[in-house]
């Protein structure tokens, strides 16, 4: 936790809040020379979740603009190819559709796939009116909703594979409602449209099964015998921070190392407000199962009585008005962070003497604690997977104008004890960041502080990247590059900026990994890589190829075990010293009360 005894906190200068950037929009041009023409009345409208729109509007503020939408590993492969095939949105083969043939020669030379994509125009059939054409265009817009929290990529439907090249911000602003079509007198609809009723019903049923009703998803309703017109309407509720799901590259990353996809989060992202209430009436607290603790409070497990949901409860004592102010800032920050690699906030309750934050329970424990296990075979590819996820989470934070400012191994947790999904936790020291305003802080854990924090200089998003470099160095070697015998020596080592790659421990580490670290642990913050540059670095790419030839066990496991043992000893020493001081104070007070 950021609030552990190893942290240093001297002063805080709060920045002003800033609006989150807007996401880009993407376009998908139509094939040259192809006129889609009116839809065939026998052909069912394409489900909105399987289509893309070439003119989707830009996202509202607060939408996530970072990563490409996901391609899910769930479901059969054929569904991912339905976007451009000749049988798009139809249950029957394209050969059964009426074709327009000018001459026998052109009819023979035309491929079947081209005939199916040409719109199947027939001179003998009446053309569909403008309103119906607009309805079909609206139906091609992508589904704006994700089925769950960004923390749960495993349950993303396979029907969302076609969104892989479309930024998530484009899919967050509109929903689609199926309403009965009203035909104008000048638009005679063929009576044979009713024959496509069964096909349309099956198409709707298939989409309904794969994308259950959620706010912002495509809604199917109306009498199918009269046809359906899809209209784009504003989303019922816009979330701050668009959900992110696994991209194809990241999904491939998990398939390399894990037997199963990452598990889902227990609840969707939500906007939390601090409210007064009785904790014991809603939650069963388990103080015996402690997860952590520090200066500001303790963390334990709990269970929501109404749902049986297991959560982590962070209990903060209200000793001064500033304590509540800090908690409100933490809630505000976490409301922005809708990402699979960032812990999710569930509820916040205030009592007369304390504030309790209920958060997602992460059962895997600290990342470092897991990889030092003797049964765990840590390779450089494992390290790449962990580092890339951390950089993904940092990138989302920075796009939402949030700085963590206390990134360290204790704040990187594994979702479970078998997979490779990790999450960043503890936003108690996080700050809103405006690049146009100066922000200075002088708190954090000395071992992972950047030189600008130690010097109380202006900080930026590159401040978190220094800490990312130190964590990566430790994952690869098991050594802490600036750790001294005490905090003063550690801070002096940070200010000097002198560090090196130990020849023995980095013997099995690739040059790409060393280059990655060398571009993060840089004294001049302007020369450091940002999170986006980290994700584009060669070391964090082409993992499938590297996994085939990189299975050598890193030496960092043994050294990390020694590091963790030393850290535990230091924590126990501080705890015992504090208890002894308290005992002496209590004894002195008792003697004074007796007049001794």
UniProtKB/Swiss-Prot annotation:
Phosphothreonine sites (modified residues): 445
Sites of N-acetylalanine modification: 2
Subcellular location: Cytoplasm
Broad class of enzyme this protein falls into: transferase
GO biological processes: cardiac muscle contraction; cardiac muscle tissue morphogenesis; neuromuscular synaptic transmission; peptidyl-threonine phosphorylation; positive regulation of gene expression; protein autophosphorylation; regulation of muscle filament sliding; signal transduction
Region of interest (Disordered), residue spans: 1-224
Residues given in the record as ATP binding sites: 291-299, 314
Protein EC: 2.7.11.18
One GO CC term, this protein: cytoplasm
Catalytic residues (UniProt): 406 (proton acceptor)
Molecular function per GO: ATP binding; calcium/calmodulin-dependent protein kinase activity; calmodulin binding; myosin light chain binding; myosin light chain kinase activity
SUPFAM superfamilies: Protein kinase-like (PK-like)
Biased composition annotated in UniProt, kind: Low complexity: 88-104
Compositional bias of kind Basic and acidic residues: 40-63, 189-209
The reaction(s) this protein catalyses: L-seryl-[myosin light chain] + ATP = O-phospho-L-seryl-[myosin light chain] + ADP + H(+); L-threonyl-[myosin light chain] + ATP = O-phospho-L-threonyl-[myosin light chain] + ADP + H(+)
Residue stretches making up the Protein kinase domain: 285-540
Reported tissue expression: Heart and skeletal muscles. Increased expression in the apical tissue compared to the interventricular septal tissue.
CDD domains tied to this protein: STKc_MLCK2
Similarity comment: Belongs to the protein kinase superfamily. CAMK Ser/Thr protein kinase family.
Disorder named in the UniProt entry: Cardiomyopathy, familial hypertrophic: A hereditary heart disorder characterized by ventricular hypertrophy, which is usually asymmetric and often involves the interventricular septum. The symptoms include dyspnea, syncope, collapse, palpitations, and chest pain. They can be readily provoked by exercise. The disorder has inter- and intrafamilial variability ranging from benign to malignant forms with high risk of cardiac failure and sudden cardiac death.
Protein's name according to its UniProt entry: Myosin light chain kinase 2, skeletal/cardiac muscle
Organism of origin: Homo sapiens
């Amino acid at each position: 936790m950021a609030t552990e005894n190893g942290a240093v906190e001297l002063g805080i200068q709060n920045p002003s809040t800033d609006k989150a950037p807007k996401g880009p929009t993407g376009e998908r041009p139509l094939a040259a020379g192809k006129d889609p023409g009116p839809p065939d009345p026998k052909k069912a409208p394409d489900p909105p979740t399987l289509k893309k729109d070439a003119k989707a509007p830009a996202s509202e503020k607060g939408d996530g603009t970072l990563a490409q939408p996901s391609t899910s590993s769930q479901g059969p492969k054929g569904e991912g190819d339905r976007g451009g095939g000749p049988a798009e949105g139809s249950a029957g083969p394209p050969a059964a559709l009426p074709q327009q043939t000018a001459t026998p020669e052109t009819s023979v030379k035309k491929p079947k796939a081209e005939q199916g994509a040409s719109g199947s125009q027939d001179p003998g059939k009446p053309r569909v009116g403008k309103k119906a054409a607009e309805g079909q265009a609206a139906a091609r817009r992508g589904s704006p909703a994700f089925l769950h929290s960004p923390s749960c990529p495993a349950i993303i439907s396979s029907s969302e594979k076609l969104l892989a090249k479309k930024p998530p911000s484009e899919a967050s602003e509109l929903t689609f409602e199926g309403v009965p079509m009203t035909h104008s007198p000048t638009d005679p609809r063929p009576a044979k449209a009713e024959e496509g009723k069964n096909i349309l019903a099956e198409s709707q049923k298939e989409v309904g099964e794969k994308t259950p009703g959620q706010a912002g998803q495509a809604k199917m309703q109306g009498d199918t015998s009269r046809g359906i017109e899809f209209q784009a309407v504003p989303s019922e509720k816009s979330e701050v921070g668009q959900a992110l799901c696994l991209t194809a590259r990241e999904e491939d990353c998990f398939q390399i190392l894990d037997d199963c996809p990452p598990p889902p989060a227990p609840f969707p992202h939500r906007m939390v407000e601090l409210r007064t209430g009785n904790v014991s009436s809603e939650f069963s607290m388990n103080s015996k199962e402690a997860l952590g603790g520090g200066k500001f409070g303790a963390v334990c497990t709990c269970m929501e009585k109404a749902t049986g949901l297991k959560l982590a409860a962070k209990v903060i004592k209200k000793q001064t008005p500033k304590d509540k102010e800090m908690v409100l800032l933490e809630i505000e920050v976490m409301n922005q962070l809708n990402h699979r690699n960032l812990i999710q906030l569930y509820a916040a309750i205030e009592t007369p003497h304390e504030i309790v934050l209920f958060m997602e329970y992460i059962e895997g424990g600290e990342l470092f604690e897991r990889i030092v296990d003797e049964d765990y075979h840590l390779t450089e590819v494992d390290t790449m997977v962990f580092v890339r996820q951390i950089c993904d989470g940092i990138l989302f934070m920075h796009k939402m104008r949030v700085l963590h400012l206390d990134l360290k191994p204790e704040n990187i947790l594994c979702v479970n004890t078998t997979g490779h999904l990790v999450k960043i936790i503890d936003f108690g020291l996080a700050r809103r960041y405006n690049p146009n305003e100066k922000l200075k802080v002088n708190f954090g854990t000395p071992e992972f502080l950047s030189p600008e924090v130690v010097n109380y200089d202006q900080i930026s998003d590159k401040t978190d990247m220094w800490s990312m470099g130190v964590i990566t160095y430790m994952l690869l070697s098991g050594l802490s590059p600036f750790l001294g015998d005490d905090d003063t020596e550690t801070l002096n080592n940070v200010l000097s900026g002198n560090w090196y790659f130990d020849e023995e421990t980095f013997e099995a580490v690739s040059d790409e990994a060393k280059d990655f670290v060398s571009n993060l642990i840089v004294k001049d913050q302007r020369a450091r890589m940002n999170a986006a540059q980290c994700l584009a670095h060669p070391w964090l790419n082409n993992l499938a190829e590297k996994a085939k030839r990189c299975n050598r066990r890193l030496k960092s496991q043994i050294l990390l075990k020694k590091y963790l043992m030393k850290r535990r000893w230091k924590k126990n020493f501080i705890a015992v010293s504090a208890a002894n001081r308290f005992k002496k104070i209590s004894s002195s007070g008792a003697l004074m009360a007796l007049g001794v």
